[in-house]
Amino acid sequence: MKIEFCVTSIEGAIAAEQFMADRIELCSRLDLDGLTPSLNLIKQCRSEYKGEIHIMIRPEDGPFICNDSTLNKMRDSVVKSAEIGINGIVFGLLTNKNEINLKATALLVEM
């Protein structure tokens, strides 16, 4: 069984490592159900945390329904985060009918 900590800071990542977490889910703004963390925070955590890092890919507050602009922001975050060395992403995309948006999900997964 893998142990994952959801963290929003470098201090959280360091604590997760001290408690021997296998990976962290790095987010910002948990009060908004989690948003994409800043690139600076991702870089800091990557340099300090030795385990797997998965980041939340959610550029804005609101429903998990996205338009083309939001999807482009998400794709940009995936590319930039991969360059830093993250291990995975966490996201959710729905249609206007609250069903999984398979097309948009496939675009992110295939990157």
Model-flagged regions — what are they?
Residues 10-14, 18, 30-51, 69-72, ...:
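Active-site-adjacent beta->alpha loops and helix N-cap segments on the catalytic face
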Residues 3, 15-22:
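A short, Lys/Arg-enriched amphipathic alpha-helix followed by its capping loop at the start of a domain
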Residues 21, 50, 85-86:
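A structural motif
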Residues 39-44, 57-64, 87-95:
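Low-complexity, flexible helical/coil segments
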Residues 75-82:
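Extended substrate/RNA-proximal surfaces in nucleic-acid metabolism proteins
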Residues 1-9, 57-75, 94:
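Active-site mouth loops of central-metabolism enzymes
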Residues 17, 82-83:
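Non-catalytic positions within long, well-ordered alpha-helices that form the structural scaffold/packing
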